[in-house]
Amino acid sequence: MAAYTPSYPLTLPTVTGVRTQNFGLSRVVAVTQSPFTNQQQVYEHEGAQWKATFTLPPMKKESAAQWLAFLMSLRGSRGTFKIGDQDRKTIQGTATETILVNGAAQTGNAINLDGFTASRANVFLAGDYIQINSYLYMVSANVTADGSGEATVYVEPSLRTGIEAINDNTTVVYTNTTTIMRLDSNELNWDTDKVSIYGISFSCSESL
C-alpha cells in the first residue's frame, strides 16, 4: 500500500484546551565587545521565531487518544500545525471590521492596513496579535484609524515577506490568531497513572 502523509499544517484537537503555556519570541542578535574598552557592536539578524511549550490538563484516555493521535501524525519535527498564544485569542482594541492589507510589497516592522471605521481610536492596542497569511505578529503600539479608515500598524517580528508574499487586500486575522509551528523533538512521550489519567506536554518552534 502507498504511504500516507497527512496534509500539513494540522489543526489542533478541540477535545480539551491547554492548561499552561510558555509562549515567546526568540531573536538572533550578535554582540561583540572590545576587551580593552568594553565598547559593544550589536547586529540584529533577520531571524526571529515564536517558541512555545504547552502543558495539557490531566485527562482520561479517551481524550488523550485524540491528542496522541494528533501528535503522532506530526511525525516528530517533520509535520507542522497551527497554534497561537492560547491566552490572547481576542484583541483588546476596538476593531470589528474586515481589515485588509493596504498595498503590496510591504516590508519591515510597519504595515499599512485599511477597512477600519473612519477616525476610530484604539482599533488595535499594544500587545494585540494579528495574523497575516500564515504568520503571527504582535502589535507594538496603539493604533488609531485616520479619516479614511486607514492606519499604519507597527508589529514584531518583522513581516515574513521573504517566506510568504503579502499581497494587497490580504485579509488580516485578529481573532484566534495562529502561526505555523513544528515540534522541537522527534520523541513523543506521555505520563499515565493507575487510574488512566494522562499527562501530556510538548514544545514547538515556528516553522520558517
Regions found by a protein language model. Name each.
Residues M1-L208:
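Extracellular/virion structural assembly segments
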